[in-house]
Amino acid sequence: MASHIIGNRNSTPEASKSSLRPPSSSRNLATHQLRASADMSGFPSPLSSRSIRPASEVYFNQQAQTPGNAEDPLDRAAQQWLADIDQYETTLEEMAAATLDQDFKDELSAIEQWFRVLSEAERTAALYALLQQTTQVQIRFFIQVLQQMAKSHPMSGLLSPANFGEKGIDAMSNRLNDAMSKLNVDSSRNSLGRPPPSPGAKRNSGLDSSTINAMFPDAAAAIAKKKAEFTQQTGNAPPSNRNSAVFNERTSFVAPTISAPDNSADNLSQPPVSPWAQRGASEPQPPIARPKSSSGQQPMGQFNQSGLRSPLPTSQTATIPAPEIEAPLLSPYNVNASWASMTNTPMTATFGSQLGAPHQQGSDMVANATAMKLAALSTVNNRIALDDARKYRRARSNDGQGKNASNNTGAQSIQGGLASPGLPVAGQLLNAQQFAALQAQQQAAMAGHRSRPTSPGIAMQGGALGPMGFTSPQNNGFLTAYDPNNPLIGNGLGALGMGQFGLSGHEGYLSDHSEINRGRSPRGRRGSSKPPEDPTDPNLLKDIPSWLRSLRLHKYTDNLKDLKWTELIELNDKQLEERGVNALGARNKMLKVFEQVKEAKAEGKLDNATA
């Protein structure tokens, strides 16, 4: 019976491919015709064309669309070319508009001043670190600009091998263009790809094309070259009003190909996703556009991976504790103003993602504070004065001891009233009046104009003698200009009026600081109490070199020895500067002595000198 049932299972016709009839059970042969009449294997099965392995409907739709898109590669290449040209022009317009922004110009000026003082190796390292943050579109843009700059440079033909510009650069450019064209969106993502260009969409830039070309000549030349290549290969010039986006207003710095749609209900007004970064529609993507200075922005430049030095390490969720020490305003570790002066600005949120929106506001404040600080430091007499960083490292490593030592030093400075031309120690800040006084003292010291103290007794410039310590400021980390009257230099004798005790102080113009260090009297002194020689002495006026030596102005003998004293006293400030008397203090002293000689001449005291 079992063999009979097995034989009846294959009782369908030979031509049939499949059957929907259930398997036979323990029925007899009388039901065989009934089973045959119910067999539907003669009808074509709707699943007969399906292969053994199932596939999705998307795959069949892609196969169905493929034969009708035979000319798509050429069309897509032309569209990509037009989009690239349009994207370069858009980038150029936005760059020109950003360059005219006053806030951006101020920040850029501060960055350029910082960049100008770097060495060539440091500049190369900085540029290399910045290039690590560029996108693919920016890389292509920079390649075009650098190629144009290299071809226009007069030394490129001498430094490059023969025909490198024709073979090497063009070959690299062709390979790059081929590689970028292969990264285009496939036909399955045409719905999210680049929308068709709308010829009616005009640019909203208010800048003239000649202005943009004048601001960026190399980039404009690269774009013109691209247009010429497109015209040569296609025979049609690219339209000037082409816009690669569906929306009318340009709200981004870059073309729509490097932006992602936001999480909104209507995605038609948003630019399409980037073909180079395969992200989902719901996955957030940070904007690549650089907003204005007043808006929130992502910080740029994680330079630690590029080999640049950083004072403090940075991490994704680092918490920076506030040190106990109160640092001065111009300290390189100024923890009171902003941590941007201590660390490189990270690419991602330094304080974690839990802060959310306040981080963007904080990063904006950090960027503005950094720009303002750079601008302020670069405009203080065109020099930047910073405290020594080693002092703060010692204070930070020894916590309490370093703080107490710094405070004690500051207390001594306040009690003693020492007028140091350098910056104060930790914990003491300068106000505007103190800083102006220190600047005036430094300028007077550099000019060399000092007057002898005329007050009776011990006349000390700056305060009492009690808490003054005769130590070198350089050992304490001061960055000071050399001041001969500073109580901390030269054992403090330069600031004391010691004439009554047999120790002569220096009067008038100090021409050589070595006179203080060696402890000898300036040339022309014959005794500690004898005043300098009279500048109106007729015998001295006949000998200009000796006369200048008596005034401690003998370094200008070669500039003035060809003049008679009658001609010399008629010179004004501008004429003295033209003759090489560059020091302001020397010119002022000469003019003052000239007036004395003129008065003596008017009184008839110099009749012997004119004879």
Swiss-Prot record:
GO biological process terms on file: nuclear-transcribed mRNA poly(A) tail shortening; protein transport
Sequence ranges of Polar residues compositional bias: 230-246, 260-271, 292-318, 398-415
UniProt keyword annotations, A-Z: Cytoplasm, Nucleotide-binding, Protein transport, RNA-binding, Transport
Stretches the record annotates as Disordered: 1-49, 185-211, 227-246, 257-318, 393-416, 509-542
Function: RNA-binding protein involved in post-transcriptional regulation through transcript degradation.
PANTHER family named in the record: PROTEIN SMAUG, STERILE ALPHA MOTIF DOMAIN CONTAINING PROTEIN 4-RELATED
Protein name: RNA-binding protein vts1
